[in-house]
Every structure is written in structure tokens, then in C-alpha cells.
């Protein structure tokens, strides 16, 4: 019987030794109704690194994540991105610095084709028509969606929509991409495919903090993972495989 090699989720060694932290949080605290739902979260994410925030519903991981991306304002603590204190920055200012956000929900235009979805973002950038076309083709190829480039988003499968959503989030070449529970609602058969979609961009040095309410899908790709319970980060989880 032919032996199938185990998936390689390892981070490139050059990215470990030659780059510093892209993202850092210092003592993040969020209080709702007199209760600290997040109580002193410290986190660092380096270039080319995937860091998982793990925990059950209500543990504080999503609130921590939302404070990082700018959806929720912390009561205290700081968020540092590329050397800039962005704690009080709205999402659009963080995006201008290169902080990308990938929500759980589909963020695509359903009535546009796959390539039109990508070009819609490219048209907001200071690029020539030729440069926009080249970048679009580059992303279509990178995510294996060239053959469906002319298909409308309405006709796509769940996996194809996920590919398009991630491709759109990388159009502007962000320094970090923050997928919010990327495995939520994903068919078990498609988990490996989504893991690859999350892992591949880090080969270019992209920093990837991510959240998940189960460890099974995230632990194999995270380096490291931080379990969160009752608003606090527990001991660091095992490294990615």
C-alpha cells in the first residue's frame, strides 16, 4: 500500500529567525456589566506565524479577537500593530496599516462573478488596469479558482466561497490576516482544504492570529495556541505539527 505523507504545516525557518512581531497585545481588559469578560490578555504574533485563540463559547476569545481588529474598544490595555499603538484606531485605520480581517460570514458580492469580486477591491487601489488584471489572475491561480472565474458567486459551493473570501481579503497584501473561526460550519471532509487555505498565505510572511471554539482543527496549524478560559489566557498549547 502506498504511504501518504503527512501534511506539512511547518512555518518556514527563515520567517522565524529573521522577522519580529507584527502584532502585540498588552494586558487587554474588557468589562461588561461589572464583569471582566477579558482580563489581561497578552499576545504576540510574528511574521509568518499562526497563533490560535482557543476556548469554548463565552470564554472571552471572541471579545479578545474583536478588540484586536477594532470591533470592540478595550477598557484598558494596548494593541500594537507594526510598531504603532492602534488601540483607539477604528477598523479602517487599522486596515490602512495592513491589518486584514476575515469574518465568519461570507463577505462576497453574490451577483458578481468570481473575478469581478476580486476586481471590485482592486479598483479601489492606485494600480493601472494591467496591474489590476495581473493581481487578479495571480489570486485566481493561488486559490485554484481560475476555472470558475466567470461564474457568479451565487453558484459557488461552500468551499469555493471560502476560497474567494480569503482571496478577496488578500487583495491589498495585508501584513496580517485575522480569520474569525475559519472552520465554523465547514464540512469535516473540507477541513484539510481550509487548513491549507489558512496556512499557505503565511509563506509570504503574513501574520495570522485566529480563533476557534474547538482545538481539533486549529492545533495542527497553530504555533502556538493559547487556550482562553474565563477571560484569561491559560498555559500555551502545543506547537503546530
Where are these regions (language model features)?
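Conserved catalytic motifs of ABC-family nucleotide-binding domains
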Residues: 173
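Catalytic Walker B motif of ABC-type/P-loop ATPase nucleotide-binding domains
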Residues: 177-180
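Helix-to-loop junction immediately C-terminal to a conserved catalytic motif
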Residues: 69
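Conserved ABC ATPase signature
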Residues: 152-156, 160
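The feature captures the beta-strand-to-loop junction immediately N-terminal to the Walker
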Residues: 54-56
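Conserved ABC transporter NBD signature motif
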Residues: 77-84, 97, 135
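Conserved ABC ATPase "signature" region
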Residues: 119, 130-148, 195-199
Amino acid at each position: 500500500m502506498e504511504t501518504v505523507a503527512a501534511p506539512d504545516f511547518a512555518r518556514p525557518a527563515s520567517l522565524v529567525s529573521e522577522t519580529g512581531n507584527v502584532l502585540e497585545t498588552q494586558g487587554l481588559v474588557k468589562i461588561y456589566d461589572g464583569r471582566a469578560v477579558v482580563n489581561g490578555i497578552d499576545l504576540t504574533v510574528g511574521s509568518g506565524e499562526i497563533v490560535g485563540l482557543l476556548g469554548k463559547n463565552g470564554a472571552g476569545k471572541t471579545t479578545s479577537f474583536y478588540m484586536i481588529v477594532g470591533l470592540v474598544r478595550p477598557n484598558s490595555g494596548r494593541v500594537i500593530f507594526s510598531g504603532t499603538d492602534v488601540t483607539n484606531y477604528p477598523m479602517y485605520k487599522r486596515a490602512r496599516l495592513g491589518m486584514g480581517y476575515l469574518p465568519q460570514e461570507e463577505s462576497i458580492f453574490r451577483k458578481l462573478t468570481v473575478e469581478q469580486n476580486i476586481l471590485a477591491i482592486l479598483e479601489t487601489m492606485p494600480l493601472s488596469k494591467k496591474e489590476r488584471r495581473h493581481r487578479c489572475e495571480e489570486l485566481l491561480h493561488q486559490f485554484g479558482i481560475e476555472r470558475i472565474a466567470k461564474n457568479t458567486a451565487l453558484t459557488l459551493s461552500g468551499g469555493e466561497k471560502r476560497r474567494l473570501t480569503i482571496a478577496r481579503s488578500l487583495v491589498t497584501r495585508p501584513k496580517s490576516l485575522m480569520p474569525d473561526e475559519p472552520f465554523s460550519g465547514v464540512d469535516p471532509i473540507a477541513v484539510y482544504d481550509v487548513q491549507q487555505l489558512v496556512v499557505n498565505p503565511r509563506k509570504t510572511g503574513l501574520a495570522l492570529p485566529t480563533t476557534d471554539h474547538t482545538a481539533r482543527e486549529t492545533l495542527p496549524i497553530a504555533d502556538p495556541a493559547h487556550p482562553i478560559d474565563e477571560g484569561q489566557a491559560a498555559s500555551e498549547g502545543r506547537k503546530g505539527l
